[in-house]
């Protein structure tokens, strides 16, 4: 207590994604800036929220985390964004608060903090097609796959801060999509112009890509709603403790 008033600490929450589209509904009215190739959005109410994206893969996720930490340390972090489903029963376009993350490269397992859901997610070094999804499901017992979450989980563990993982399903197990890996640059950025030229002359992919676009939009909306509800519940619990 200082001068007869309570001093309330501001919680600094980081939200790390791969692509701006994943964050769009969440950060629509937030302040945006670009720092060294990383897109950063900030919002302040009673607490401070910082979202960032730098591309696909663990190296890009690490750069995004570093950009968020540039001003000050963070108190908790979310890995956030689109994922593929590894089972048919998972809702395409829906959001999941995962139980934990497995790194397919190292076998490491990271638990999410209290309040997380039931599904496990595996982080792959590549975009998984149907065959790879089936292999990952069998090898790790996970329901979801991404390319970044393990890096964020590891960084959170090193800093001893709470880690959460909220993901939205953009593509189901049986989705027949182009090989996205050939259009991801060394920096993790998706080379959209090359991809458009590729699919423009391959109409067999058009229906599935249209479905994926719509599912991705729904997933982004669902993630924003899930994150907002989760943070409201968490902040309410902390207020009761105080």
Kindly give the residue locations of the regions a language model identified.
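Short glycine-aromatic motifs
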Residues: 29-35
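Small/polar loops that bind or transfer phosphate-bearing groups
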Residues: 17-18, 53
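Glycine-rich phosphate- or other oxyanion-binding loops that anchor nucleotides, phosphorylated ligands
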Residues: 35-238
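Extreme N-terminal starter segment of soluble prokaryotic enzymes
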Residues: 10-14
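Helix N-cap/beta->alpha junction signal
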Residues: 19-20, 149
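Short N-terminal binding/cap micro-motifs at the start of the first secondary-structure element
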Residues: 21-26, 60
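Short, Lys/Arg-enriched N-terminal segments with co-localized hydrophobic residues
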Residues: 2-9
């Amino acid at each position: 207590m200082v001068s007869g008033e309570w001093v309330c600490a501001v919680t600094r929450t980081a939200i790390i994604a791969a692509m701006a589209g994943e964050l769009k509904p969440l950060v629509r009215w937030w302040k945006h800036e670009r720092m060294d190739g990383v897109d950063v959005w900030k919002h302040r109410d009673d607490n401070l929220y910082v979202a960032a994206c730098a591309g696909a893969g663990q190296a890009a996720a690490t750069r995004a985390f570093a950009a968020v930490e540039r001003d000050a340390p963070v108190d908790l972090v979310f890995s956030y964004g689109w994922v593929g489903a590894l089972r048919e029963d998972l809702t395409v376009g829906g959001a999941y608060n995962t139980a934990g993350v497995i790194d397919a490269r190292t076998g490491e397992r990271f638990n999410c903090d209290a309040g997380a859901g039931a599904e496990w997610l595996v982080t792959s070094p590549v975009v998984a097609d149907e065959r790879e999804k089936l292999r990952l499901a069998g090898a790790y017992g996970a329901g979801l796959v991404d390319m970044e979450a393990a890096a964020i989980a590891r960084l959170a563990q090193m800093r001893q801060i709470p880690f959460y993982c909220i993901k939205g399903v953009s593509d189901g197990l049986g989705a027949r999509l182009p090989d996205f890996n050939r259009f991801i640059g060394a920096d993790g950025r998706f080379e959209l112009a090359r991809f458009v030229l590729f699919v423009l002359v391959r109409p067999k992919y058009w229906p599935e890509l249209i479905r994926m676009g719509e599912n991705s939009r729904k997933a982004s909306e669902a993630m924003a709603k899930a994150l907002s509800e989760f943070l409201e519940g968490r902040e309410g619990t902390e207020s009761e403790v105080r």
